Regions:
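Phosphoinositide system proteins, centered on phosphoinositide phosphatases
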Residues: 163-169
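Aromatic-capped interface at the extracytoplasmic side
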Residues: 166, 179-184
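Active-site-adjacent, His/Asp/Glu-enriched structural segments that form or flank metal-binding
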Residues: 170-172, 186-190
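Sec-dependent N-terminal signal peptides
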Residues: 4-13
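Peri-catalytic and regulatory segments of divalent metal-dependent proteins
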Residues: 18-160, 177-181, 190-234, 238, ...
Length: 244
């Protein structure tokens, strides 16, 4: 079942690639708002075909309400963002191009308070509002189309399945990989900062972010499925805790 969703994520990237402008010059590498909306619709269509999605009305409704509350308190209160829940026990959530956020069921179980859960959702909302994925694609303008596409796929997959990301990254050059990871680490720091502002604006306890990072650090220490340090698209968790 999980494999089905990973394939859908890859197909979502394929949709993205088919609608990307040429990456030859910087100005044409930026994705327009209309293109993002189109991509988001395609992603949701494919997600809705998956049997890995939890469709419980109460849980999904709760996530939607929480998400809307955080969006209203974010840097772009009018932004339309769609949420879905992945039937996966690992602690994770990920933002995708087109205003789509996936949340693993394991995140709900690992969150001790609503503020902890909200801190993760606000972080992903920040990724979307700060246009981190489209900015990444623009930053890769000098890379070959194939390398850029593979990195885009890998970075999305890394948020849901590190092992799959490792395989995909093998198809991209080492230089492009390192440059992209440096870029995404900066994105993570920015998403932390903006996300905490959103959390505070929405009336949640910002200490929830610190508490969740502590939980995440413990999970990484004892989880055999954690990605190697050089493939992590997030800053070292201890550094993120100290930054809060």
């Amino acid at each position: 079942m999980k494999k089905t969703l990973y394939i859908l994520i890859f197909l979502s990237c394929s949709v993205m690639a088919n609608n990307l402008p040429e990456l030859g010059d910087y100005s044409s590498s930026k994705i327009s708002e209309n293109e993002e909306i189109f991509i988001g619709r395609q992603i949701l269509f494919q997600v809705n075909q998956s049997d890995s999605i939890i469709r419980d009305i109460e849980v999904s409704g709760y996530l939607d309400l929480l998400g809307k509350k955080l969006i209203k308190a974010s840097t772009d209160p009018a932004k339309k963002i769609e949420f879905f829940i992945v039937n996966d026990s690992s602690i994770n959530a990920f933002a995708m191009l087109g205003g789509v956020i996936g949340v693993h069921s394991g995140l709900f179980l690992a969150s001790n308070t609503e503020s902890e859960l909200a801190s993760v959702i606000s972080h992903e909302i920040a990724h979307i509002n700060q246009k981190h994925i489209s900015r990444f694609l623009a930053q890769q303008e000098r890379a070959s189309y194939q390398s850029t596409f593979l990195m885009a796929v890998a970075l999305l997959l890394a948020r849901s399945n590190p092992q799959l990301a490792s395989t995909t990254m093998a198809g991209a050059s080492a230089g492009s990989v390192q440059g992209a990871l440096d870029f995404t680490r900066e994105n993570e720091k920015e998403a932390d900062r903006v996300g905490i502002q959103t959390l505070n604006n929405a009336g949640f306890d910002v200490r929830g972010a610190r508490d969740f990072f502590t939980t995440l650090k413990k999970d990484n220490q004892f989880s055999g499925g954690a990605a190697p340090a050089f493939l992590q698209t997030h800053p070292i968790t201890s550094n993120r805790i100290s930054d809060i």
